[in-house]
Swiss-Prot record:
Family assignment from sequence similarity: Belongs to the thymidine/pyrimidine-nucleoside phosphorylase family. Type 2 subfamily.
Name of the protein: Putative thymidine phosphorylase
Record-linked SMART domains: PYNP_C
Pfam families membership: Glycos_trans_3N, Glycos_transf_3, PYNP_C
Gene3D superfamilies given in the database record: 1.20.970.50, 2.40.40.20, Nucleoside phosphorylase/phosphoribosyltransferase catalytic domain, Pyrimidine nucleoside phosphorylase-like, C-terminal domain
Keywords, alphabetical: Glycosyltransferase, Transferase
GO cellular component terms listed in the entry, alphabetical order: cytosol
Superkingdom of origin organism: Bacteria
A GO biological-process term: pyrimidine nucleobase metabolic process
Lineage: Bacteria, Pseudomonadati, Pseudomonadota, Gammaproteobacteria, Legionellales
Length: 517
């Protein structure tokens, strides 16, 4: 709203846009990363400014300002003159109970016109991408507006040049680490494969050889465990950038939660919206992976692309497209990318869930007889590729050097040192409740559905309950007898165990048995 009045000489003076004050009440409502403001239906500000449900509103507290989406309260949750904020908005403004906020209409968004440009199929410049990414990060674009940008950028609608510009804009939105070493290696797995916890084996092998590998990893959002969740069962992962640097300079490597360091922070927002609309865009995936690697300060990256019917990458043609984009865009941005297409047809190792996956990792690092060989072999292949980034390692010899570092115990010793440097090694916990799922008939395992198995592990409590998840006893190609356990569900509570068992009754085709040949 603008106010105008007559000046002494008869001219009209227009004052700046007015804002209105409301007193804050803490409601304690979590909306993840979405800024929401709650106002009464009869609020005088709503009426005077024409605010309606879902209106985007500028909210200012002192020197801090955000744009929030309006939700209207029809009960007595708020008193007249009060407003509430979602926890995310509350923390963004550093608000306290009783603080007075100012609310007003925000300025028109330049970024929204660029989103429209992309919707109509036109190519975006780096400057336009940067404006969009800055508004994504600051919360000026709503989730609905972000989803429009993501949809307009999916299904091959981003050119290779646009993917490069988007990647660069995402890197420039956060911090960028630099290291003393001229060669810095990073490793990434595209995902969709339960139990594929190779990072915890690759990092100590590479660090023990003497190469620098500062690994930032994510927590689970839709899976039973992220690498950070699994590592957290063994050592602290929430390290400040200063502490992370100290660990890497001391031990050549680390395995920390990426959320504690501001590397390509806009990516976290885009991923959250992508998952909400169940959208996988190859252009966005490439920008997401490469922006994180480059922001970490990597000069070389080894990327594992598991391919399988229930993995994230479902077929060979999609895998080859992803491989080409990662290598070409990485090269244009000064990152040497090496991709490996691997078997994504079934889970890796025995454990699915933080503690159970950590148990498998420790078995491999310690060379125990019951260590899962598939996890060991995948980790050695990836570690070998990482070692071959160094001119000291001839092509083709990386895996044998990695094997020697693992079998000699040097990798385990380095892993212990990294854990101690990050804050101390922890003992693994075990679940209170277990339930074995047995074979209804004798046969050979012909198919394992990664997604359904992961869903059961999540219903059992993973990753929030660190010891919850699934212990997989049979893999594809193995024969089982009638009544033999196929997998065991682990849970911290009987209620969560019942939830997981309920899903079992609905979905009988998680592990399919064929005839013994």
């Amino acid at each position: 709203m603008h106010h105008s009045f007559l000046s002494a000489n008869g001219g009209i003076v227009v004052s700046k846009q007015t804002s209105h004050g409301l007193r804050l009440k803490h409601l304690g409502i979590k909306t993840y990363h979405e800024a929401i403001i709650y106002m009464r239906e009869d609020c005088h500000v709503c009426h005077s400014e024409g605010f309606e449900v879902q209106t985007r509103i500028q909210v200012t507290l002192g020197q801090r300002s955000i744009i929030a989406t309006l939700n209207v309260v029809t009960s007595e949750l708020l008193q007249p003159g009060e407003a509430g904020l979602s926890d995310y908005a509350w923390e963004s403004l550093h608000a306290k109970e009783g603080d007075e906020i100012q609310v007003s209409h925000p300025k028109p968004l330049e970024s929204l016109s660029y989103v429209h440009t992309k919707i109509y199929g036109k190519e975006l410049s780096y400057e336009q991408m940067k404006v969009i990414i800055d508004d994504v990060l600051s919360g000026r674009l709503s989730d609905v507006q972000i989803s429009a940008f993501l949809a307009a950028s999916s299904a091959g609608r981003l050119t290779r040049t646009e993917i490069m510009k988007l990647t660069k804009a995402m890197i420039d939105s956060g911090d960028r680490l630099s290291w003393s070493s001229p060669l810095v290696v990073d490793k990434h797995c595209v995902g969709g494969l339960p139990g594929n916890r190779t990072t915890l084996i690759v990092v100590p092998i590479v660090a023990a050889f003497g190469l620098m590998i500062p690994k930032t990893s994510s927590r689970a959002i839709t899976s039973p465990a992220g690498t950070a969740d699994t590592m957290e069962t063994l050592a602290p992962v929430h390290l400040s950038p200063q502490k992370m640097r100290q660990v890497v300079e001391q031990e050549n490597g680390c395995i920390v939660w990426g959320g504690a360091v501001s590397l390509s922070p806009a990516d976290d927002v885009l991923i959250r919206v992508e998952r909400a609309i169940d959208l996988d865009s190859e252009g966005q995936l490439v920008a997401s992976i490469l922006s994180k690697k480059i922001a970490t300060g990597a000069t070389h990256a080894v990327i594992d692309i598991p391919v399988g019917p229930t993995a994230k990458v479902r077929n060979q043609s999609m895998a080859l497209l992803l491989k080409q984009l990662l290598e070409e865009v990485g090269n244009e941005l000064g990152l040497v990318v090496r991709t490996l297409l691997t078997d994504g047809s079934q889970p890796v190792g025995h454990g699915i869930g933080p503690s159970l996956e950590a148990r498998d990792v420790m078995a491999v690092l310690q060379g125990l007889p019951d260590a899962p060989n598939d996890l060991r072999e995948r980790a050695l292949t990836l570690a070998g590729a990482a070692l071959e980034c160094s001119s000291k390692v001839p092509p083709g010899l990386g895996k044998s050097i990695a094997t020697q570092l693992l079998d000699s115990g040097q990798a385990f010793k380095k892993f212990q040192a990294i854990c101690e440097a990050q804050g101390g090694m922890r003992e693994l916990t075990k679940a209170r409740f277990t339930y074995p799922v047995v074979a209804a008939k004798a046969g050979k395992v012909s198919l394992i559905d990664n997604r359904k198995l992961a869903k059961i592990a999540k219903l059992a409590g993973a990753p929030k309950s660190k010891s919850a998840g699934i212990d997989l006893h049979s893999h594809v190609g193995e024969s089982v007898e009638k009544g033999e356990p196929l997998f065991t569900i682990h849970s911290e509570s009987s209620g969560e165990l019942h939830y997981a068992c309920d899903l079992l009754r609905d979905k009988q085709d998680i592990i399919i048995l064929g005839e013994n040949s």
